């Protein structure tokens, strides 16, 4: 069994060369990245009781970034001192990520793999699942695999899209067809997952929800912000019990 959807991997592999082009096809992700990093960093510090004054605050933490792409989240985590492993089912993405991290003198362990193939059981303090779960083939297997890789008491961040009329209008019609922020076909609305559905799946795999936050785009200042509105983008922070 596998969580890999070959069509999804091929889709993102074809864009691999553009990962670090802030004005290219991944421009929306570069715009989205600051709020993701801010939220994840704040929650990690709060959960693990890490002082804001500490230099390299994550230097005792092992982080697994699943579906790491070109390393847009892996690199900021490494700069904060974390021991980062980034995995992606696309070999081309991994090569791009490796080259970019080496150019920036960052030590990140990049592996062409998927979570069910890793052997590091209960190895990681934190797992990052950011905008990945809506692209996997088998959601249950994916979450179960994450649970096996995370230490008891560890944190997991799962960011995805809600399956609502609003998300269809904004994430599919708006982002792909009207604004052309994303290539047409990037998302399949039927694979979007409602927060209550995801919480249930996480609970079955021994995860307890700490917090759910919406992530909302402001078209006037072109910035993302945290929100209580879960109708489109949202992120669940959960701990393994």
Residues of each region from the PLM?
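Acceptor-substrate binding/catalytic loop of class I
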Residues: 160, 180-197
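Short, flexible, mixed-charge acidic loops at enzyme active sites
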Residues: 167-177
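Conserved SAM-binding loop
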Residues: 51-56, 61-166, 195-198, 236-240
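Conserved hydrophobic residues forming the short capping helix/wall of the S-adenosyl-L-methionine
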Residues: 44, 48, 101, 202
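Conserved alpha-helix/loop element of class I SAM-dependent methyltransferases that forms part
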Residues: 31-59
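N-terminal, positively charged/glycine-rich alpha-helical extensions of SAM-dependent methyltransferases
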Residues: 1-26
């Amino acid at each position: 069994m596998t969580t890999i959807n070959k069509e999804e991997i091929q889709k993102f592999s074809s864009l691999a060369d553009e990962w670090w082009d802030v004005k290219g096809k991944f421009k929306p992700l570069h715009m989205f990245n600051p709020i993701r990093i801010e939220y994840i960093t704040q929650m990690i510090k709060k959960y693990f009781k890490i002082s804001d004054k500490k230099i390299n605050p994550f230097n005792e933490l092992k982080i697994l970034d699943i579906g790491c792409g070109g390393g847009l989240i892996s690199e900021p985590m490494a700069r904060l001192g974390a021991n980062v492993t980034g995995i992606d089912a696309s070999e081309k993405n991994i090569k791009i990520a490796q080259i970019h991290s080496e150019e920036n003198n960052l030590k990140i362990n990049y592996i062409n793999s998927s979570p069910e193939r890793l052997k590091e059981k209960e190895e990681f303090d934190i797992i990052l699942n950011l905008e990945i779960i809506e692209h996997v083939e088998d959601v249950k297997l994916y979450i179960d695999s994450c649970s096996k890789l995370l230490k008891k008491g560890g944190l997991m961040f799962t960011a995805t899209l809600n399956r609502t009329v609003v998300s269809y209008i904004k994430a599919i019609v708006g982002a792909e067809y009207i604004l052309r922020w994303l290539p047409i076909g990037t998302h399949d609305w039927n694979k979007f997952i409602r927060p209550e559905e995801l919480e249930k799946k996480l609970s079955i795999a021994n995860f307890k929800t700490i917090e759910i936050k919406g992530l909302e785009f402001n078209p006037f200042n072109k910035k993302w912000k945290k929100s209580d509105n879960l109708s489109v983008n949202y992120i669940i922070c959960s701990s393994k019990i």
